[in-house]
């Protein structure tokens, strides 16, 4: 009879085993500084909050960056820090017409940028060649024939608000990427797919323009009034000096 527990002892045992679990002894300051996240979210958050662009401007669209950097728009609030070296940049903003002579330099700058890297094509001349796409023999009809483009920003020129919208859309794209599956993703844009439909023409200044039909009348008129040629004028001047 002495081994039978009392009613009070049974109540104490039940309250200790079946009662509510006590709150963990964690301070409020520590609980407010703990964030549960994944590697993808942490990596993408760090990159989209600190995009460092390399500004590649060749024409009038690039003037909009003067207003963009100013205090009215202040693109530093997006974490954009312009860099002068492609090895320190992860965003290439191409603004203006790209010519055949500048194409190798643009491709070299893109290849020197570390991965992951992104490209924004800014302006009509960058995207399609713009007003130079019809008659110019040196303008590239779209920068996507040289390097991959992630975001197209049309306009002539685009306003600073449009550039902000493009940066926000690019940040969303960066935030949805996977750290482990990035190398498995292939480009699906028009990269090296459309060729330039150009034909070779003879140079206009070839040294024989005086033989054209439009110049023969002027040469005949000069002979009729006995105008001295260039060599005769030089000989006359030399004799006078001697």
Swiss-Prot record:
A GO biological process of this protein is: electron transport coupled proton transport
Q: Its principal location?
A: membrane
Localization recorded for this chain is: Cellular thylakoid membrane
Membrane topology, record value: Peripheral membrane protein
The record's section on InterPro entries has:
NADH_UbQ_OxRdtase-like_20kDa, NADH_UQ_OxRdtase_20Kd_su
A single GO molecular function, which one? quinone binding
Name the cofactor(s) required for activity, per the record.
Answer: [4Fe-4S] cluster
| Residues given in the record as [4Fe-4S] cluster binding sites | 60-61, 125, 156
Catalysed conversion reaction = a plastoquinone + NADH + (n+1) H(+)(in) = a plastoquinol + NAD(+) + n H(+)(out); a plastoquinone + NADPH + (n+1) H(+)(in) = a plastoquinol + NADP(+) + n H(+)(out)
What is the E.C. number?
A: 7.1.1.-
Q: Which Pfam families match?
A: Oxidored_q6
- Note how many cofactor molecules are bound and how: Binds 1 [4Fe-4S] cluster.
Tell me which SUPFAM superfamilies the record gives.
Answer: HydA/Nqo6-like
Q: Keywords assigned by UniProt?
A: 4Fe-4S, Iron, Iron-sulfur, Membrane, Metal-binding, NAD, NADP, Plastoquinone, Quinone, Thylakoid, Translocase, Transport
Q: Which residues cross the membrane?
A: none
| General function of this protein | NDH-1 shuttles electrons from an unknown electron donor, via FMN and iron-sulfur (Fe-S) centers, to quinones in the respiratory and/or the photosynthetic chain. The immediate electron acceptor for the enzyme in this species is believed to be plastoquinone. Couples the redox reaction to proton translocation, and thus conserves the redox energy in a proton gradient. Cyanobacterial NDH-1 also plays a role in inorganic carbon-concentration.
Which NCBIfam families did the record assign?
A: nuoB_fam (TIGR01957), PRK06411.1 (NF005012)
Record family assignment:
Belongs to the complex I 20 kDa subunit family.
The name under which this protein is listed is NAD(P)H-quinone oxidoreductase subunit K
